[in-house]
């Protein structure tokens, strides 16, 4: 069974974090909420989120790390040395994945210096494109380049989560139909 760590920090965007957790858990993917700021965090819209665990070296055992955006959440994720070190390791492993949405492609991936030469999307504006100047910036809703998956922001969180299911080898069509995505 594949395993996923959805990272959170104070100021993380709750839609982006919890949508991914919800969709993956519906498909019975082992998905843990892993905090860099203690068991309980306040999201970007002041919602308390209780993590399953706090980051430690076991983070390296997951198959995928998901980085939600949000300000200052993305900056708080980028300041965690163990997370940045792990992202660098994952970036060169074919069977490990890094998924980032909203501000995190620009803020966290650039901090790890793993965006160079990749096709990457992120939240538009706010100087994020400038942080991604070593990458090829796209406006796709979800962008996949090798083992790095990126997306735009809160409105694309469902598409992002479904793409992560597909990449992990699960059937996103079945889950999306159960969630009535086909009605949109």
Give residue spans per PLM region:
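Extended, subdomain-level signal for the structured scaffold at the beginning of enzyme domains
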Residues: 1-96, 106-111, 116, 127-139, ...
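Anionic-ligand binding patches
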Residues: 120
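Beta-strand-turn-beta hairpins that frame and shape the catalytic cleft
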Residues: 143-148
């Amino acid at each position: 069974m594949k395993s996923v760590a959805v990272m959170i920090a104070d100021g993380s965007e709750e839609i982006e974090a919890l949508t991914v957790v919800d969709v993956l858990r519906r498909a019975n993917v082992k998905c843990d909420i892993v905090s860099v700021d203690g068991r309980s965090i306040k999201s970007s819209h002041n919602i308390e989120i209780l993590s399953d665990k706090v980051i430690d070296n076991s983070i390296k055992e997951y198959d995928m790390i998901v980085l939600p955006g949000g300000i200052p959440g993305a900056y708080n994720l980028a300041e965690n040395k163990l997370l940045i070190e792990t992202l660098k390791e994952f970036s060169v492993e074919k069977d490990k994945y890094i998924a980032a949405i909203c501000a995190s492609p620009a803020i966290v991936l650039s901090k790890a210096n793993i965006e160079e030469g990749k096709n990457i999307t992120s939240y538009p504006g706010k100087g994020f494109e400038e942080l991604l100047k070593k990458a090829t910036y796209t406006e796709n809703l979800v962008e996949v380049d090798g083992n790095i998956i990126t997306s735009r922001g809160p409105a694309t969180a469902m598409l992002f989560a479904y793409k992560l299911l597909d990449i992990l080898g699960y059937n996103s069509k079945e889950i999306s139909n159960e969630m009535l995505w086909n009605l949109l």
